[in-house]
């Protein structure tokens, strides 16, 4: 009987120790969903209330959102949207906007430093890069009716596309990457989200060109710049096959075969950090054919993308 009692005590102690270990692991990890969302002219241009834009964010179950195009014809809707959600927003309500229910402990040009409930910190930057000249339209000879730049030249080669993209967006991307390199906390998670107004070299591949999806292979410079700087593209990491999972975010306003546009993936969630583990990524949009999460009616001309991550407290580096 004593041996049985001792065995039961040992099992009880073991169970308690295992339970404590589980609790400690949970305390050292935190799950977040980071979203990039161009809300299209303040979120109300389709005649829908701003609450529908808030619904998109809620349905995505995001808790950090990089926002683009907050300005409506009546003014900037950043503060209104944050109020509907009951969230905090970055100090700049016009550009580099980030919304989150978590505590914002610092504001930067184009982003924030956020404190998570786990005590961990993360940096989040939101980009909205210039849309003109837009290389897919230049290569395909497209001038949409709504386009203001009727003098934009058409181009024919990959070299021309790369050069035009660098000229249009290179300064902003380089500036942001320099800013990130100067961050004091080298161990913290860093997220860069936004409407890049430029496709990815991971999508405009030789295979995609041969299949007729895109007019040619293009090594777009700024997706490559993000990769060179140590960032990973969340959606394309989860879905590496660009042919099976195009992940188009531009644009739900057009039919697939509409010759006045070209469907593409130009909205991204990039991530970096030893403590960051990617769990999944989804597109939010207007129907099941084009999105993983459906919100109808859909209030924007861009589909949103949200990625889920597990953040763990980084282990100290050991010197060799």
Task: Give names to the regions the model predicted.
Residues 65-68, 91-92, 99, 191-195, ...:
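Active-site neighborhood of phospho(di)ester-bond hydrolases with catalytic His/Asp-centered motifs
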Residues 40, 71, 128-130, 196-199, ...:
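Catalytic metal-binding/acid-base residues of hydrolase active sites
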Residues 3, 9-10, 22-83, 121-122, ...:
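N-terminal, active-site-proximal structural segment of metallo-dependent hydrolase catalytic domains
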Residues 68-146, 282-283:
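Structured beta-strand-rich core segments of catalytic domains in phosphoester-bond hydrolases
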Residues 11-19:
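Sec-dependent N-terminal signal peptides
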Residues 137-164, 207:
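A solvent-exposed, charged loop/short amphipathic helix patch at secondary-structure junctions
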Residues 107-117, 181-190, 197-320:
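Metal-dependent phosphoester-hydrolase catalytic domains
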Residues 165-193:
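His/acidic metal-ligating clusters that form di-metal
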């Amino acid at each position: 009987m004593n041996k049985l009692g001792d065995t039961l005590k040992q099992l009880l102690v073991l169970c308690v120790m295992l339970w404590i270990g589980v609790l400690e692991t949970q305390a050292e990890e935190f799950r977040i969903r980071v979203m990039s969302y161009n809300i299209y002219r303040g979120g109300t241009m389709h005649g829908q209330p701003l609450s529908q834009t808030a619904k998109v964010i809620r349905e995505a179950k995001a808790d950090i959102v990089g926002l683009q195009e907050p300005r409506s014809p009546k003014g900037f809707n950043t503060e209104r949207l944050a109020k509907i959600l009951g969230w905090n927003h970055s100090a700049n309500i016009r550009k580099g906007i980030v919304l989150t229910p978590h505590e914002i402990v610092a504001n930067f040009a184009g982003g924030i430093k956020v404190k998570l409930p786990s005590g961990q910190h993360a940096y989040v930057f939101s980009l909205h890069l210039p849309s003109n000249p837009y290389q897919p339209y230049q290569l395909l000879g497209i001038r949409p009716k709504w386009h203001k730049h009727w003098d934009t030249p058409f181009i024919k080669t990959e070299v021309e596309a790369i050069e035009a993209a660098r000229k249009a967006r290179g300064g902003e991307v380089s500036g942001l990457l320099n800013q990130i390199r100067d961050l004091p906390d080298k161990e913290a998670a860093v997220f860069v989200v936004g409407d890049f107004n430029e496709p990815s070299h991971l999508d405009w591949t030789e295979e995609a060109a041969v299949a007729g999806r895109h007019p040619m292979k293009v090594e777009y410079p700024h997706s490559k710049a993000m990769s060179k700087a140590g960032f990973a593209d969340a959606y394309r990491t989860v879905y590496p096959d660009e042919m099976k999972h195009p992940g188009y975010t531009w644009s739900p306003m057009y039919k697939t075969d509409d010759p006045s546009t070209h469907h593409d993936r130009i909205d991204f969630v990039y991530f970096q950090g030893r403590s960051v583990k990617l769990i999944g990524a989804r597109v939010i949009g207007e129907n099941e054919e084009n999105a993983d999460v459906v919100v109808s009616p859909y209030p924007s001309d861009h589909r949103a993308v949200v990625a889920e991550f597990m953040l763990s407290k980084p282990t100290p580096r050991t010197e060799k």
